[in-house]
């Protein structure tokens, strides 16, 4: 049983989603958005750090998963996104959480089945997978998608490790 915090970083809106992985089941614990004010970037980064730190304190996750930076058309936007990611990652590292990063296409593939999915498809599938009563906010749904991607990746790695151990045992008997 592990608790996973997923983050969809942004300099103005950072989505978060928290799930518990119990065997093959994923249980929704919470989600939302950290909305920064129209202050200068350094103060927004401070708000992201404080918000993520508060979420970590509230939910006590075992793992921290975050979406990787994609190449934006606007270099300034990509740099600000990278700084927002950095603020969130520092909060996780300060809490001594392991940090995992996933590409947006991999997250969409894990949640929807195609890396080219749009936001509404991710929202719909997150709602279905976690049995939510309504559609989550877009940024929160993306963050829950990051957490789901990590849970699925983690399950696959554990299964592969178990198969490798079984194969080794069989071979050396």
Curated annotation (Swiss-Prot):
Its cofactor is Mg(2+). GO terms for molecular function: crossover junction DNA endonuclease activity; DNA binding; magnesium ion binding. Mg(2+) 1 binds at residues 8, 139. Transmembrane segments: none annotated. This is Crossover junction endodeoxyribonuclease RuvC. Belongs to the RuvC family. HAMAP family: RuvC. Keywords: Cytoplasm, DNA damage, DNA recombination, DNA repair, DNA-binding, Endonuclease, Hydrolase, Magnesium, Metal-binding, Nuclease. Mg(2+) 2 binds at residue 67. Homodimer which binds Holliday junction (HJ) DNA. The HJ becomes 2-fold symmetrical on binding to RuvC with unstacked arms; it has a different conformation from HJ DNA in complex with RuvA. In the full resolvosome a probable DNA-RuvA(4)-RuvB(12)-RuvC(2) complex forms which resolves the HJ. The gene is ruvC. Binds 2 Mg(2+) ion per subunit. The active site is at residues 8, 67, 139. GO terms for biological process: DNA recombination; DNA repair. It catalyses: Endonucleolytic cleavage at a junction such as a reciprocal single-stranded crossover between two homologous DNA duplexes (Holliday junction). Signal peptide: none annotated. Its main location: cytoplasm. It comes from Vibrio cholerae serotype O1 (strain ATCC 39315 / El Tor Inaba N16961). InterPro entries: RNaseH-like_sf (IPR012337), RNaseH_sf (IPR036397), X-over_junc_endoDNase_Mg_BS (IPR020563), X-over_junc_endoDNase_RuvC (IPR002176). The RuvA-RuvB-RuvC complex processes Holliday junction (HJ) DNA during genetic recombination and DNA repair. Endonuclease that resolves HJ intermediates. Cleaves cruciform DNA by making single-stranded nicks across the HJ at symmetrical positions within the homologous arms, yielding a 5'-phosphate and a 3'-hydroxyl group; requires a central core of homology in the junction. The consensus cleavage sequence is 5'-(A/T)TT(C/G)-3'. Cleavage occurs on the 3'-side of the TT dinucleotide at the point of strand exchange. It is an enzyme of class 3 (hydrolase). CDD domains: RuvC (cd16962). GO terms for cellular component: cytoplasm; Holliday junction resolvase complex.
């Amino acid at each position: 049983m592990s608790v996973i915090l997923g983050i969809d970083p942004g300099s103005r809106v950072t989505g978060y989603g928290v799930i518990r992985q119990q065997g093959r089941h994923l249980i929704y614990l919470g989600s939302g958005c950290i909305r920064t004010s129209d202050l200068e970037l350094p103060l927004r980064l401070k708000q992201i750090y404080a918000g993520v730190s508060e979420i970590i304190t509230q939910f006590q996750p075992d793992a921290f998963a975050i979406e990787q930076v994609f190449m934006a058309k606007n270099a300034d936007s990509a740099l600000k996104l990278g700084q927002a990611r950095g603020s969130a990652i520092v909060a996780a590292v300060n809490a001594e959480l392991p940090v995992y990063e996933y590409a947006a296409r991999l997250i969409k593939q894990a949640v929807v089945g195609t890396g080219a999915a749009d936001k509404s498809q991710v929202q719909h599938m997150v709602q279905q997978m976690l049995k939510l009563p309504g559609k989550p906010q877009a940024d929160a749904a993306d963050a829950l998608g990051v957490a789901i991607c990590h849970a699925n990746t983690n399950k696959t790695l554990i299964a592969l490790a178990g198969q490798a151990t079984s194969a080794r045992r069989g071979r050396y008997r």
